[in-house]
Amino acid sequence: DALLYVANWPEPRRYPWSQLLIARAIENQSYVIGVNRVGMDGKGHHYTGDSASVDPRGDADVMKASKEDVLHTVLHREALDDFRAKFPVAMDADDFGLML
């Protein structure tokens, strides 16, 4: 399982962007791919990229900043299944419903 986030986070928000990618990977026990823009927009906001691939443990195995580039990463299904088997948080889920 993998989550893909395409974003537009400017340079002053680099830290929250990276931390949110890590948090999403951990809480969902999934790989997370975060793709953020680079360069300058029409209002003068600077974007540093900081695109990343994060594993379910929260380790960023690829991170790029400041320039347009192509990232390559390999996601390992067996490693994901093994991690989930050893740390089965999904077993704590409760059935619930939303009444609108």
Spans of model-derived segments:
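CN hydrolase (nitrilase-like) catalytic-core segments centered on the catalytic cysteine
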Residues: 1-71
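Cysteine/selenocysteine-centered motifs that mediate thiol-based redox chemistry or coordinate metal-sulfur cofactors
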Residues: 81-100
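A short, polar/charged loop-to-alpha-helix boundary motif
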Residues: 69-86
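A broad, structure-centric signal for solvent-exposed, well-ordered loop/edge residues
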Residues: 42, 60-61, 80-82, 90
